Amino acid sequence: MNIKLLPEVGDLVVVKITEVKNFGANGILEEYPGVEGYIHISEVATGWVKHIRSYLREGQRVVCKVINVNQERKNVDLSLKRVNQHQSREKIAEWKNEQKADKLFEIVCSKLNKDLEACKKEFGVRLVELYGTLFAAFESAAAAEGEWLPDINGDWKDTFVEVAKENITIPEVSVAGYFEAYSLASDGVEKIKEVLTIPPEIGKAELEYVGAPRYRIVVRDKDYKKAEETLKKIVQSVTDKAKKLQVELEFSRQ
């Protein structure tokens, strides 16, 4: 769902080529209905372009950078050469995610027995303003463990979360590090075991014995910041116990 009528200079856009001429190519902007774009041959590739059809063809989708916007005519000038492969891949992935989000939004509207435009006005536009993209809103709803958006009221929220959790898979991230624990006490092995025992109320983590005196710890979560916070709490807890039990301890990030 795009709430802007026109892109801005510097934006990356997905363009479907509709016509290729000797000195340029025309295309439609997939994310902006009714908006056309033009790529001059000088903006197709770095260096001299002898045959433009070696780079562009009708029906092809490319990612371009907006270099000029004509508000009155609703058309834009575009550059293909100013977009690198990494930017192109990311933009295409983002566009496909938004297409998926639009379909999920239609499902939400259908379940609510409401018109698509009515849903956009009621909560769609607000979610895009809040999260930047509709897909990001669905990701947030899918990852929610408690009440989602507690400061916002609406009978649509439960349905939105339901559709999100059924259709969006949140990939896990992991943060890891190494503990090195030493003790010369007669019961040193038991002390080290106690030091490296992680209280469940702090968080879940995987502890793996690598080889004396190293232990690898991994924290997984769908939220990177939460994973970092959990690891930080675990390290603090283990460090405090090590001091109390007189176990020498070192921690390093992987």
UniProtKB/Swiss-Prot annotation:
List the signal peptide residues. Answer: none
Matching CDD domains: S1_IF2_alpha
Q: Which UniProt keywords apply?
A: Initiation factor, Protein biosynthesis, RNA-binding
Please indicate if the UniProt record lists Transmembrane helix as a keyword.
no
Top-level taxonomic group: Archaea
TM regions (residue ranges): none
Pfam families from the UniProt entry? EIF_2_alpha, S1
* Single GO MF descriptor: translation initiation factor activity
Q: Which residues does the UniProt record annotate as the domain S1 motif?
A: 10-81
Q: How does the record describe its quaternary structure?
A: Heterotrimer composed of an alpha, a beta and a gamma chain.
Purpose? eIF-2 functions in the early steps of protein synthesis by forming a ternary complex with GTP and initiator tRNA.
Similarity annotation: Belongs to the eIF-2-alpha family.
HAMAP family named in the record:
eIF_2_alpha
Name of the protein? Translation initiation factor 2 subunit alpha
- Per the UniProt record, the source organism is Thermoplasma volcanium (strain ATCC 51530 / DSM 4299 / JCM 9571 / NBRC 15438 / GSS1)
| Gene of this entry | eif2a
